[in-house]
Amino acid sequence: MAASSRAQVLDLYRAMLRESKRFGAYNYRTYAIRRIRDAFRENKNVKDPVEIQALVNKAKRDLGIIRRQVHIGQMYSTDKLVIENQEKPRA
């Protein structure tokens, strides 16, 4: 993978994770983060430039979907789950 495409992929990966962390709903947030990490790990050994470009284009579309869903989730927020309200144990 060329240096520029590697940097582009890393920027896209970080942007997707950053945007996913903005989900208000715990289940959506954890699912999106897990799915992004799994997808990038699964495709990390792809060498074909055409396939890499197709995956980058798909990731860009997915980033747009994540942004839209985060925005919709913020408009129609719900109460936090019990798991989100737990305090972290003190050391």
Curated annotation (Swiss-Prot):
The record's GO molecular-function terms, alphabetically, read:
protein homodimerization activity; structural molecule activity
Task: Tell me which InterPro entries the record gives.
Answer: Complex1_LYR_dom, Complex1_LYR_LYRM4, ISC_assembly_LYR
Query: Does Mitochondrion appear among the keywords?
Result: yes
Q: What is one Gene Ontology biological process annotated in the Swiss-Prot or TrEMBL record?
A: [2Fe-2S] cluster assembly
Pfam families under this entry?
Answer: Complex1_LYR
Q: Which residues carry this modification: N6-succinyllysine?
A: K47
- Pathway membership: Cofactor biosynthesis; iron-sulfur cluster biosynthesis
What does UniProt give as GO cellular component?
L-cysteine desulfurase complex; mitochondrial [2Fe-2S] assembly complex; mitochondrion; nuclear body
The UniProt annotation places pantetheine 4'-phosphate binding at R6, K44
Listed A to Z, the keywords are: Mitochondrion, Nucleus, Transit peptide
The protein's location, in the record's own words, is: Mitochondrion; Nucleus
What family is this? Belongs to the complex I LYR family.
The record's note on quaternary structure and interaction partners says:
Homodimer. Component of the mitochondrial core iron-sulfur cluster (ISC) complex composed of NFS1, LYRM4, NDUFAB1, ISCU, FXN, and FDX2; this complex is a heterohexamer containing two copies of each monomer. Component of the cyteine desulfurase complex composed of NFS1, LYRM4 and NDUFAB1; this complex contributes to the stability and cysteine desulfurase activity of NFS1. Interacts with FXN; this interaction is nickel-dependent. Interacts with the cytoplasmic form of NFS1; the complex increases the stability of NFS1.
Protein role: Stabilizing factor, of the core iron-sulfur cluster (ISC) assembly complex, that regulates, in association with NDUFAB1, the stability and the cysteine desulfurase activity of NFS1 and participates in the [2Fe-2S] clusters assembly on the scaffolding protein ISCU. The core iron-sulfur cluster (ISC) assembly complex is involved in the de novo synthesis of a [2Fe-2S] cluster, the first step of the mitochondrial iron-sulfur protein biogenesis.
Name this protein carries in UniProt: LYR motif-containing protein 4
Natural source organism: Bos taurus
Specify the taxonomic lineage. Answer: Eukaryota, Metazoa, Chordata, Craniata, Vertebrata
What gene makes this protein?
LYRM4
